[in-house]
Amino acid sequence: MKVIFLADVKGKGKKGEIKEVPTGYAQNFLIKKNLAKEATSQSIGELKGKQKAEEKAQAEILAEAQAVKAVLDEDKTRVQFQEKVGPDGRTFGSITAKKISEELQKQFGVKVDKRHIVLDHPIRAIGLIEVPVKLHKELTAEIKLAITEA
């Protein structure tokens, strides 16, 4: 019996796969537990439609990420911060991924999720700093920061 897997089943198939399995196994286990459904011509068509929609959505997300990368790669895109500095040359407050995301939105209208900004520890130094940002699983860019003394 041909089935379409609705979830990953160890040793049998992954979600979205169409495979031939024994009829008893399909009816008594896979279909009862909603791990798979019978592969009729209609359900195969639905699956192909879903996969096309998923690919289209992924392509749109990638295109959006590339547009953000193009803006971040421009020389004039430099996020300005003015911080109070102590006698040792370190800032009183630290610059976090959240602050960077908010300032990027405020100064350039570019929306980047704070969870995508790769920051090992908050920034406490003044000067020009480049911070990597993971825009998409296969696309990274650099945010340029200019931190000056207030």
UniProtKB/Swiss-Prot annotation:
Protein keywords: Ribonucleoprotein, Ribosomal protein, RNA-binding, rRNA-binding
Keyword Ribonucleoprotein: yes
GO molecular function terms noted in the UniProt entry: rRNA binding; structural constituent of ribosome
Top-rank taxon: Bacteria
Record-linked Gene3D superfamilies: Ribosomal protein L9, C-terminal domain, Ribosomal protein L9, N-terminal domain
A cellular-component GO term for this protein: ribonucleoprotein complex
GO terms under biological process: translation
Pfam families cross-referenced by the UniProt entry: Ribosomal_L9_C, Ribosomal_L9_N
Keyword RNA-binding among record annotations: yes
Family: Belongs to the bacterial ribosomal protein bL9 family.
NCBIfam families found in the cross-reference section: L9 (TIGR00158)
HAMAP family: Ribosomal_bL9
PANTHER family for this protein: 50S RIBOSOMAL PROTEIN L9 (PTHR21368)
Role of this protein: Binds to the 23S rRNA.
Protein's name in the database: Large ribosomal subunit protein bL9
Organism of derivation: Streptococcus pyogenes serotype M18 (strain MGAS8232)
Gene designation: rplI
